[in-house]
Amino acid sequence: MGFISSILCCSSETTQSNSNSAYRQQQSSSLNKNRSVKHSNTKSRTRGVHQTNSPPSKTNSAATFSSTERSTGKSGISTNDNEKKKPSSPTAAVTATTTNNMTKVEKRISKDDLYEEKYEVDEDEEIDDEDNRRSRGIVQEKGDAVKDTSRQKKQQQQQQQQSQPQPQPQSQSQSQSQSQSQQRGPTVQVSSDHLIQDMNLSRVSSSSQASETSNDADDEDDEDEEYIDLTLLQQGQYHAPGYNTLLPPQDESTKGKKCLILDLDETLVHSSFKYLRSADFVLSVEIDDQVHNVYVIKRPGVEEFLERVGKLFEVVVFTASVSRYGDPLLDILDTDKVIHHRLFREACYNYEGNYIKNLSQIGRPLSDIIILDNSPASYIFHPQHAIPISSWFSDTHDNELLDIIPLLEDLSVKTSLDVGKILDVTI
């Protein structure tokens, strides 16, 4: 008995070892299958391709399970019963769960795709609806516009028909005369449209004539409003004693000479209240009960210029400065007494706040008056009588006064010509 039992024990151990090795091989194979399935699933998800992996066959697991049962001694259970029952091994459970998860993921993906397709279809339908509405609105607008134009045309036709004179019933004498004219031959007939056109033309011509007359009247009113008699003096404006002009009549020494009007500041001299090292002389001027020093610089060539023009013209210094400054300055500047007259700010014409030198009030013919000034605003009323000159401040190389002398000499010789016409062409 001891020998047999030992043999039986050995056989049972060998059978158990064989069954254990078979069980381990089964587990390793199932794990490898699960790994391959998971790897394939990840690839299909990344590529966006939905692959349907068939679950592992239950027959193999059932066959392996039956073989293990047979080895352990449970041979009474058939393979069909094992297929119906759930496997009790952990590998089979893992495979079942993976297959279930795969099917759920596929269902979810398919549902999402359906939702996206439905959403795209809804958007397309909404866009089509908007296009249809717009097209309907455009068609309606066009139809309304056509209706409006047709109504307007009908109204115009009705108005034309109403405006046309209605034919009056003809008398018997008129009908007889028409029949006689038809027997005699064709006559020229004038349609009502031509008559209406003629009437309209006559109305237009009459209205245009009326508008022209009204425009002429308006122009005359504007001219009356804009016209200013520059020869009239303003209230408080300076004038020569006993005369309504700025200057008295010419005396024997200036008869037959043209009148040359010269500006003072920045034309003949430059003066400043600030200290000037190069000042030719200094004036003491009283302003608001205070004495101020005025530093004066002579323009280069001013003495020679005054000497030359004093022999050719009636020289008048016309400045917008006050007399209490201008008089002492001219006393120093005009040592040879070549300046015949002096006019200051009170002799200027006040036009919109500006001091204008009105040449019409000088008391000399405009054809004989020349003005030399650095400010165009001063001679704005008579620009054709001006000789422009640049403003001078301290340039020691300036020669404009001497350069103008030849032009002035030519103008002084031509006594019979209008100075304004000559200067308007040459300058």
Curated annotation (Swiss-Prot):
PANTHER family per the UniProt record, alphabetical: DULLARD PROTEIN PHOSPHATASE
A molecular function GO annotation: phosphoprotein phosphatase activity
A Pfam family matched in the record: NIF
Subunit and partners: Interacts with WHI2.
Biased amino acid composition, Acidic residues: 119-130
Any single GO CC term annotated in Swiss-Prot or TrEMBL for this entry: phosphatase complex
Polar residues bias (residue ranges): 14-34, 49-80, 184-214
Position(s), cross-link Glycyl lysine isopeptide (Lys-Gly) (interchain with G-Cter in ubiquitin): K154
Cross-referenced Gene3D superfamilies: HAD superfamily/HAD-like
Other comment: Present with 5620 molecules/cell in log phase SD medium.
UniProt KW keywords: Cell membrane, Hydrolase, Isopeptide bond, Lipoprotein, Membrane, Palmitate, Phosphoprotein, Protein phosphatase, Ubl conjugation
UniProt cross-references to InterPro entries, sorted A to Z: Dullard_phosphatase, FCP1_dom, HAD-like_sf, HAD_sf, TIM50
Protein function: Has phosphatase activity in vitro. Involved in the response to sodium and lithium ion stress (but not to potassium or sorbitol stress) by inducing transcription of the sodium pump ENA1/PMR2. Acts through a calcineurin-independent pathway and is functionally redundant with PSR2. Also involved in the general stress response; acts together with WHI2 to activate stress response element (STRE)-mediated gene expression, possibly through dephosphorylation of MSN2.
SMART domains: CPDc
Organism placement in taxonomy: Eukaryota, Fungi, Dikarya, Ascomycota, Saccharomycotina
Region (Disordered): 14-223
Compositionally biased residues, Basic and acidic residues: 104-118, 131-151
Example of a GO biological process term: cellular response to heat
EC number, as in UniProt: 3.1.3.-
Keyword set includes Acyltransferase: no
Top-level EC class: hydrolase
Residue positions of covalent lipid attachment, annotated as S-palmitoyl cysteine: C9, C10
Organism: Saccharomyces cerevisiae (strain ATCC 204508 / S288c) (Baker's yeast)
Subcellular location: Cell membrane
UniProt name for this protein: Phosphatase PSR1
Effect of G2A: No effect on membrane association
